[in-house]
């Protein structure tokens, strides 16, 4: 664990140098949000990504006299080291002693009334990556529902979307709403959390159509064309920008027996299986923090390494089902290749049916073109940043 924490620390240093120095995140704009918290009991949804320079937003708030009564933690926990989907218990922050209420403890993703009774304002400062199935925004929506139910204020300290230049992929059919899909948005929605919160509030997407008293503290120096490089890896299996850019296309392997590199140094940028009959790349997933029991643990997998692609090409492809189709064919098109989780990730049942019937990636892409155009029009009133 100490070795893993050291790696995370070193990675955060490298990513910090790569971050866009011209962008100021919402959490750094204290003059704009501290007055909104004055004299109020504040809960903070954050994790290891909630940094302003080398200081965590929690510490920054406390240093400025904010009365933080509760910390809400998302998937991977407040420190960001738990496995994907792992239940994370609550407790207390070791440094500050502030209670941590886990929203990923396996029981409920709605905070208890007793917790909400000790809160006036919920603040959000967490780094999202702009994917419909990335759970940080889902946790934000759950908290917005709680705030609307209990009459609490809601503040989003905005951060750039590293995939904010792209809008692509199937729009979620709400029949398949789940813990990896809360809103009728494309796989790549191209919005920041602040913009997404405004859209959910404005479009009546919160439970029972309720609205929350919402404030968004925007970034400065950011546009949707900005190639923003994250200063801190957002979760254990997105260790670098290539993983972030490939995630929209390779995450679908989570619903198959194919390894997407969890348990290696290259998650989401390789894929393979012991029974694949194509590809010239071999790897063996091992147990490690953030991937304690990865698919195909300890087995030598044959497949493909996508890391030779340029970042430009990774971004340009948007959502690409070519890799899933390739693996499916290379394993002989087995009947049990897809689990029911695939529909939740894809957002509909149609894509699985098309793959099984032999459709190409381009034929699949054509199915969401009109929906993406309609979404782009619908989201325009909620955009805080120029699109170019």
Question: Where are these predicted regions, by residue range?
Answer:
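Glycine-rich, aromatic-lined ligand/substrate-binding cores of catalytic
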Residues: 220-297
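Glycine-rich oxoanion-binding loops at beta->alpha junctions
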Residues: 89-119
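Bacterial Sec-dependent N-terminal signal peptides
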Residues: 1-23
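Glycine-rich, charge-decorated loop segments at or immediately adjacent to ligand/cofactor-binding or catalytic sites
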Residues: 80-85, 155-177
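Short internal beta-strands
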Residues: 69-77, 157
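Glycine/threonine-rich flexible loop motifs
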Residues: 128-140
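Conserved functional hotspot residues or short segments at active or partner-binding sites
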Residues: 267, 271-369, 373, 387
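Conserved anion/nucleotide-ligand pocket segment
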Residues: 177-248
């Amino acid at each position: 664990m100490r070795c893993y924490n050291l790696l995370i620390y070193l990675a955060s240093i490298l990513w910090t140098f790569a971050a866009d120095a011209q962008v100021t995140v919402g959490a750094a704009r204290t003059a704009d949000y501290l007055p909104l918290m004055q004299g109020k009991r504040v809960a903070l949804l954050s994790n290891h990504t909630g940094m302003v320079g080398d200081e965590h937003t929690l510490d920054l708030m406390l240093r400025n006299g904010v009365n933080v009564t509760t910390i809400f933690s998302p998937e991977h926990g407040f420190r960001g080291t738990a496995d994907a989907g792992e239940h994370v218990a609550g407790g207390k922050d070791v440094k500050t002693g502030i209670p941590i209420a886990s929203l990923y403890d396996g029981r409920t993703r709605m905070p208890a009334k007793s917790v909400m009774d000790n809160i006036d304002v919920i603040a959000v400062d967490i780094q999202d990556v702009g994917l419909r199935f990335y759970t940080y925004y889902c946790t934000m929506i759950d908290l917005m529902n709680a705030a609307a139910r209990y009459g609490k204020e809601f503040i989003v300290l905005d951060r750039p979307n590293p995939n904010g230049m792209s809008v692509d992929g199937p729009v979620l059919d709400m029949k398949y709403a789940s813990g990896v899909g809360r809103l009728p948005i494309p796989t790549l929605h191209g919005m920041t959390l602040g913009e997404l919160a405004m859209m959910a509030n404005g479009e009546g997407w919160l439970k029972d159509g309720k609205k929350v008293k919402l404030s968004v503290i925007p970034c400065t120096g950011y546009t949707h064309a900005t190639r923003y490089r994250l200063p801190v890896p957002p979760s254990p299996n997105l260790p670098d920008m290539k993983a972030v850019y490939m995630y929209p296309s390779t995450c679908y392997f989570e619903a198959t027996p194919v390894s997407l590199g969890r348990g290696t140094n290259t998650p989401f940028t390789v894929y393979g299986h012991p029974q694949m009959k194509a590809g010239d790349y071999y790897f063996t997933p091992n147990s490690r923090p953030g991937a304690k029991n990865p698919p195909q643990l300890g087995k030598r997998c044959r497949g493909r390494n996508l890391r030779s692609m340029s970042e430009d090409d990774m971004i340009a492809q948007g959502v690409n089902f070519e890799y899933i189709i390739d693996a499916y064919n290379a394993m002989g098109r087995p009947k049990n290749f897809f689990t029911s989780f695939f529909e939740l990730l894809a957002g509909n049942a149609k894509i699985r049916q098309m793959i099984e019937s032999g459709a190409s990636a381009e034929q699949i892409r054509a199915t969401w073109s009109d929906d993406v155009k309609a979404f782009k029009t619908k989201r325009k009133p909620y955009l805080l940043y120029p699109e170019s």
